[in-house]
Amino acid sequence: MQTISLIRPDDWHLHVRDGAALATVVPHTARRFGRALIMPNLRPPVTTAAQALEYRARILAAVPPGQHFEPLMSLYLTDNTSPDEIDRAKASGAVVAVKLYPAGATTNSDAGVTAIEKVHAVLERMEKLGMVLCVHGEVTHGDVDVFDREQVFIEQVLAPLVARFPALRVVFEHITTAEAARFVQDAGPNVAATVTAHHLLLNRNAIFAGGIRPHHYCLPVLKRETHRRALVEAATSGNAKFFLGTDSAPHSRAAKETACGCAGCYTAHAAIELYAEAFEQAGALDRLEAFASLNGPAFYGLAPNAERITLAKDAWEVPGEYEYLHDDPLVPLRAGETVAWRVL
């Protein structure tokens, strides 16, 4: 049986929700990853260091006994965030990033930033302190096609932001287009990007294969095949600017399979295994460790994890659902289908 050994990876973009949901989703991540950057888009959002520390404690309480897992926290940037709150976040030692959501761009983003000019003072403080800005890179104007939101965001928001704050460390989250990959490659050393497993494995045809596929609907939405190939090329290139961020986003079956379903693919149950598939398909398994375990910590100024994990080429069937919210289950990516790699 073929096996590969990796330094234990980290997930630099993860949603775990709150309350009863934590008991299902946190163990999936803790089994595979040493650390994960937790997204702050709860309702209400995590906007202060104090709230982040309380949320961190709730996450840690859901980690199974004997598992070593460290949640790294982020704050939700709003028009009203103060530079002083950035100071408190930095001093907490637990908050490592601030997340920019353009208002209305994704799940629970209605409190997001309405105009980037409103947070310039905060960005200046972050630049001074070395705090990372994580960016959901889509505009939300009604006249912009949903498949073009990322490219327009680069032109209208991200490129001017990087030019104005050249020392600000920026992660372009869950990139989905060739234009985004090219922007990151061409930018200075303070700009990096996360790439999800589902954007490496799927193109937008997957949303419509034989009917509407709500469990393949995410934001940013899956793009055409040329973009998927560009993402694979970037992720497997060995360029340290690209690293693992699952954007695993749990929603209950009822919230997904409905007239107006939520955006998000749940991948935490098989995250590193799905990345292994993508890298194997690209003939680049030898570059998986750098992407999954080394590049992210290096950008965030952290040491790699000391532990290792082993993956075996041993196919397994993904359950059709996981218990989630009382009688409303969670449907994972590849439900009822097989994943080629297994964590031993």
From Swiss-Prot:
Transmembrane segments: none annotated. SUPFAM superfamilies: Metallo-dependent hydrolases. Zn(2+) 1 binds at residues 13, 15, 99, 247. This is Dihydroorotase. The active site is at 247. Keywords: Hydrolase, Metal-binding, Pyrimidine biosynthesis, Zinc. The keyword Ubl conjugation does not apply. Its EC number is 3.5.2.3. GO terms for cellular component: cytosol. It comes from Aromatoleum aromaticum (strain DSM 19018 / LMG 30748 / EbN1).
